[in-house]
Amino acid sequence: MKHLLLLRLVLPKPNYILRRSFLFHSGKTTPSPLDPYDTLQRRVARSGDPSASIIKVLDGWLDQGNLVKTSELHSIIKMLRKFSRFSHALQISDWMSEHRVHEISEGDVAIRLDLIAKVGGLGEAEKFFETIPMERRNYHLYGALLNCYASKKVLHKAEQVFQEMKELGFLKGCLPYNVMLNLYVRTGKYTMVEKLLREMEDETVKPDIFTVNTRLHAYSVVSDVEGMEKFLMRCEADQGLHLDWRTYADTANGYIKAGLTEKALEMLRKSEQMVNAQKRKHAYEVLMSFYGAAGKKEEVYRLWSLYKELDGFYNTGYISVISALLKMDDIEEVEKIMEEWEAGHSLFDIRIPHLLITGYCKKGMMEKAEEVVNILVQKWRVEDTSTWERLALGYKMAGKMEKAVEKWKRAIEVSKPGWRPHQVVLMSCVDYLEGQRDMEGLRKILRLLSERGHISYDQLLYDMNGAGLSWKIVDAMGKGRYVEEREVRI
């Protein structure tokens, strides 16, 4: 995919409007009926098949003589990103650049960088970043690159970008600090969390509610209840900080992890009381998950009923309630929710069937998991790497390694650039094939991985040594040039 950079930094232009007739022909077109509910954004929202081109929807809209505003495209990209439809969002971003009547702002370029990383991988995002002139690499662009590395937990590169931002004077606010704080928590670097917080104090960078909630989350991860409680008391006493529902939800999560259910429920109730109308949808999604972790099914269903009464009923709600029920190992209730989703929800979201597949796999119900996969492939025409990898892991947990190898091979065959194989599945399959003396099967797996650029010979040796497995068989294959030698990815 070509990612065209159009940094036409000129005087501000109006919010451009485009008709297909202006681009491709001069004949008259018949505008679509004046249906207020038939908008381009609604058409895009209904076209949820990730394997289909979203540009066809846009072309169809233009062919009917309709208008396309730059602001509308921005709204559509925002919506697609919100629902993790990154490939479709990138297609529209590319389309905006290719049709020069649409002004491309520096913010658009930063969003493009983020989308390229999500769709094509960090390597493609880095190439795109290098095409941008030095004088145009602003705070937003560096911030987007920092987010790309942080989201993939590439710590050393994120730290490099953070240092560059510091040298360029881009650390005036707390946002970059929050990104790094969150990354340190996710990578278990808790001493760096304290160090960075002290740096914020030294540089007089005022923390915000996200800073507070990230620190509370760090306490909950390590089950430091005493530290969490003391920190919360200090925050409550700080008149300059306005705590929100998430503050008490994160505190509740800390209590849940420590097994202090009653204290957790007290915090969850306090969190609910602080939810305002604008945040209600997202808050209920989070709180359902926490109530599920606390084993309170009746509270999950209470919030689910409230959630369904809200305007704008989204797939994220189904994801939250299904996740909550799975935490309580209630697969029968999950199946009922799935039936409700299939019957009344038209927007396809692969994350929802993926949750059911995972639930079946954890319970060893592999036939049912296969049924869901067959529906995805046959009805929705969707073959996703993650789908097959979930099946492979399920068969591995069930001790059916022959089936695990079969499903994982299919995952590799449908994989896209940027995919990183699940190490547990990878090493289990290699170990199994080695134990079976299946040299040909092992060669095919390694060849597929190498051809698609997912793993190198050196990386495979590194992973195998870390897992305590034999490396001689892979070493022999490396010498036979079945896999390409590359730098080890750690």
Swiss-Prot record:
Location(s), subcellular: Mitochondrion
Transit peptide start-stop: 1-86
Gene Ontology CC: one annotated term: mitochondrion
PPR repeats: 138-172, 173-207, 208-243, 244-274, 280-310, 314-344, 349-379, 384-421
Gene Ontology MF: a single term: mRNA binding
Keywords: Mitochondrion, Repeat, Transit peptide
Key word Acyltransferase present: no
Segments crossing the lipid bilayer: none
Similarity section: Belongs to the PPR family. P subfamily.
NCBIfam families: PPR
Protein name in UniProt: Pentatricopeptide repeat-containing protein At2g20710, mitochondrial
Organism the protein comes from: Arabidopsis thaliana (Mouse-ear cress)
